[in-house]
Amino acid sequence: MNATDAESRKPENKPSSESSSSGSTSGSSDGEVSSKTYFKNNKSKVLSGQREVVLEVVRDLSYTICKEAEEKLVERFPRKDGSNEMLPKEDSINTNHNYTTDSNEHPVELTTKTEECKNTEKTKKKSFVRALSKDKQLSAYRSRSRSTRLSYSGHISRTHSVEKSLSRYKTSVLRNRRTSFGHGRDSSTTKRSVSRDKDNRLRRRIGSSRSHTRSHSRFRRSEKKLPSRSPRRIRSQERRHERRRSMSSDYERIALRRSEPIKRRDKDEFFKNNKKVSGDIKKGKGNDNGTVAELEAKITERQRKSLDILTSRTGGACLTPDKLRMIQAEITDKSSAAYQSIAREALKKYIHGYINKVNVDSVAVITRKLLKDNIVRGRGVLCHSIIQAQATSPTFTHVYAAMVAIINSKFPNIGELLLKRLVIQFKRAFGCNDKTVCLTSSHFIAHLVNQRVAHEILALEILTLLIESPTDDNVEVAITFLKECGMKLTEVSSDRVGGIFELLKNILHQGKLDKRVQYMIKVLFQVRRDGFKDHQSIIESLELVEEYAQFTHLLLLEDVTYPKDILNEFRFDDQYETNEEKYKALSKNILGSHASDSDGSFGSGSNSETALSDCDKGKNEVNDKYTSGDIIDETKPNLIALRRTIYLTLNSCLDYEECAQKLMKMQLKTCQQNEFCQILLDCCAEQRTYEKFYGLLTHRICKMNKSFIEPFKEIFKDICQTTHCLDTNRLRNISKFFAHLLFTDAISWDVLDCIKLTEDEAITSRCIFIKSFFQELVEYMGLYHFNKKLKTEVLAGTLAGLFPKDNPRNIRFSINFFTSIGLGGITNELCQLLKIAPKSAPSSSSSSSLSSELSAPSDDDSSSDSENKKKHKGKNKKMTKKKNPSKKKEKTKKIVGKNKIAAKNKTIKRRTDKDNSSSKDNFLKSESSSNESISLDSLSSELFAPSSYSSSESSNDSESKEKHKGKNKKMTKKKNPSNKREKTKKKLSKNKKAPNKNTKKRMTEKDISSSESSISESKSLNCSASNQNENEKRKKRVTSKSRTKRVKMFKQCQWVDADNQRDIKRKKRAEYRYEPLVYRKRNEECLKKGAPNCRKDNYGNRQNHEISQRHDSEIKRRREERKKRHHEKNHSREYKRSKLGLCQREYFLYMCCQFYYPCTFQCLCQNCHFTFYS
């Protein structure tokens, strides 16, 4: 195709050359006038060609332009026909072709100079159109050659040459266009540039024609002269071709660079002259009715100037403050860019100011102020200022981390952005070996891990990255990082932290690091041994966000790549007002509509106020409806639905933690919290027995959301006042429920100030509630720790109602109440107060009424107890007078008579309860009433100080010591008789009458102890604390005596196994008797027959052995003696039993208890009820 085109174009080029030559001759003859006309005509031709190029460029654009814009663009370029009418692209091309054909058909008449000029113009136009058609053909050929990928060098060189010609042609057109606009260039320069472009075009065409001819000639010559061509020549041609290509590309690049500013200038002037076209191009619309004039009419010139000033790089900083305020006051339209830029600058200043004021005490207040402003719009500025402030003052890192934790709980995207920027900052500093930036950024990340904003995996990744390449700086950064977040990491993943410490230990053993860094590693190990005491994860004052409310971000070092720095810059918002209103509504929900700035607590108080205000509004609306006469639904369907959902969740969950999570997801309002707590308590009270599930659940809920603590406190106070409305089962469950809450510190111990324990306000239901409540606390804590807790200074004012100190009557009542429950050790301080207090009338009625309320005995029993006490007082007085009788016989007779009366009066009816705890309570009552039991003494001595004994013990001990003085003196006198004969006689008489005397002595001691206990009850208030040392001495004597008694009693208790031993001996004797008879008969038969005796010695020799025979009379005598002994023993036992009034089983238990538990003995037999005291 190219060859044929070239051949066809060869003859066409001849007349053009001829005409040009003829024109030149004519011009030379005519002179200057002809030359001027030639240049004018040539200029018009160039402009007409530029017109077509501009039209092509405009129509090939990605967006459409209206016809009016096209007309204005092509106004300065005259058409070939001289008309300014616009035609489509195809029509213009057809007209051009017709014009050329017409010019070729008609003969040219070269008569005058003007006609010659016309012909030259026509020939030039023809060549211009041919060039355009050639460009189109060459572009098509180029695309075809790329698809087929021809390897022939001639074709490649041809395509490159065509491309060069096209690029040069376009640059020449652009230059001509610039000259047409007239930017101050001379006419000479423009003419020169046109002539240059012509020459270049002609050279290219000649070159292309030569290349075509060469290619044909080479084919022809190659048949003859193939060996003359060398590969070296081909390579040189290729190199030349590559050089030309590089030079042409460089030329194009330089030309484009030079033309860029000129283009920009032309474009600006063009758009200034044609505003409508520029507006359409910016919008990307083709045929819109709206014009730029209407849009620009809204913005005044003054506002445009202020916008330019405020949106500049300085941001209006070069202006004076007064002028800047004036400019800002003039701008009132919120949708304008100027107003938004001013608002952004103000937000930036607020954020910087608040962050610079942050400290430990003002974190919550400043975060509330920050949340009032639109920090979602200024999140980039907020994160940048926080990071900058932390870098300048690393000592406040934990404060900034607490503030970020609060913001992250409400806006997690802000926390994520800040964490991403910190990670990217750390990675850049680690790559650049910037130690200071690494330290600050890692320090901040560690505190964010402590605040649960960042996941612990990020911390472990940073540690592994630092320790993998153990340099001095890396290990130092890792140590500081571990110190800050080591406590948190050991709680969450102790195994992985242990692995990191092992790596540090290996690095330390290698010894390649600096001594300073090695010492730092040793210090870190010491800190770990101490449990990170000096480096706590979160300070109590900065633990402002609950665990369930925090949003933890799981980021990895590899994933974080983009810091979103665009958010730091100003961006125009089309929906500025709507977005601001949305944020205001959101901030009201977070902070509360009536929240004050000075409120330190974050979240809970504001939410509660808003919820309460909503509830009040609802109540007012209901009242208005009721007054208006509308029907109101009082069935409360919402409350019933809430109860149903809570009850179903409680029964459906397996674990209390799962149940707590489900209940907290319900997002209850503050007005619903009281109802929620009441439902929990009702579910716990309705159970048959107390279940720990409800106590653990409430403890978990109170720790997760502290707003539930106050409702439970109020419920406890209401129950203490309304215990009479509840039955015993519900009272026990509720008391154990609240005891669990106090033990776990879910609610504070200040609640106990509502309980008042006095004789006037004592009710049976309240006493039962207090009893089960305190017993449950003692089971959880233990008596020692419970007493220690009650003696703290914090609870001194709250326990004034339970342990009163104002009135001795109330003091006695509380002492008697707690001793009856079995918690007498709590009232030691009150007992000491009573010793110092003045004397008052004994309150026997108060103690009797309390015992009647708790144990519920009949009135007859209480009257019998009072009579017994009076009788015992009279007997004790007589006993004191008759301590030193002249004869033993009179003494024993009186004691035996008194023991019978004591045994009858000591019978007490046992109380039967459903629970097993009733028997324990009775046993504790018996111990507390006696006050001489060794078990309680041992407990009190172990738990409390040795000097703190009860007042009743000291009084009883002092009285008993005085009574026993006379006896001890007589015993010492009787131990030293004058003659040995008298000693032996007395011993024999004592051995015969040992059992009777032992029983008499024992009974006397019991009578004395019972009388002393009755006296101690009356005189316990007037005892003194000076007899404590004497009590200790007495105890030592009593223990020595009790040991001797135990040995004697053990010997007497051997009769229990005697019957079994006798049976065994009888069997042995029967066997012994039977065997000798057999041997005897056998030997007699052998002797009769004359055979020798079958018995043998030890050496195997037979011998005649005579069997020893017993006489029957001797055997009978021994049996009779044995029977007598047995009868005497049984007679003595029966005699003792008859005196004591016990059955055989009770007597056996009595003897065993005297050996093992000499303090007390309580009979468990159903027939009789008897208690013994040692």
UniProtKB/Swiss-Prot annotation:
Transmembrane segments: none annotated. Pfam families: MA3. Residues 16-35, 138-153, 597-608, 840-857, 926-957, 1010-1020 have a biased composition (Low complexity). The keyword Nucleus applies. Residues 1-51, 80-109, 136-259, 597-616, 840-1045, 1095-1133 are annotated as: Disordered. SUPFAM superfamilies: ARM repeat (SSF48371). Residues 348-531 form the MIF4G domain. InterPro entries: ARM-type_fold (IPR016024), CWC22_splicing_factor (IPR050781), Initiation_fac_eIF4g_MI (IPR003891), MIF4G-like_typ-3 (IPR003890). PROSITE patterns: MI (PS51366). One of its GO terms (molecular function) is RNA binding. One of its GO terms (cellular component) is catalytic step 2 spliceosome. Residues 201-223, 869-909, 963-1001, 1034-1045, 1119-1130 have a biased composition (Basic residues). It is found in: Nucleus speckle. It comes from the Eukaryota. Residues 641-757 form the MI domain. Signal peptide: none annotated. Residues 36-47, 93-102 have a biased composition (Polar residues). GO terms for biological process: cell differentiation; male sex determination; male sex differentiation; mRNA splicing, via spliceosome; regulation of mRNA splicing, via spliceosome. Residues 1-15, 80-92, 183-200, 235-259, 910-924, 1095-1118 have a biased composition (Basic and acidic residues). The keyword Translocase does not apply. Keywords: Differentiation, mRNA processing, mRNA splicing, Nucleus, Sexual differentiation. Component of the spliceosome C complex. Male determiner protein (M-factor) that controls male somatic sexual differentiation. Acts as a dominant factor that regulates the mRNA splicing of transformer (tra) and doublesex (dsx) transcripts and promotes expression of male splice forms of tra and dsx. Probably acts as a component of the spliceosome C complex required for mRNA splicing factor and exon-junction complex (EJC) assembly. Hinders eIF4AIII from non-specifically binding RNA and escorts it to the splicing machinery to promote EJC assembly on mature mRNAs. The M.domestica genome only codes for one male determiner Mdmd protein, which is encoded in the M region, and can be located at different loci on the genome (chromosomes II, III, V or Y). The M region contains a cluster of tandemly repeated Mdmd copies with only one intact copy: other copies are degenerate with large truncations and frameshifts and are assumed to be non-functional. The presence of multiple copies in the M region may preserve its integrity in a hostile non-recombining environment. This protein is encoded on chromosome II. Belongs to the CWC22 family. This is Male determiner protein Mdmd(II). The lineage of its organism: Eukaryota, Metazoa, Ecdysozoa, Arthropoda, Hexapoda. The gene is Mdmd.
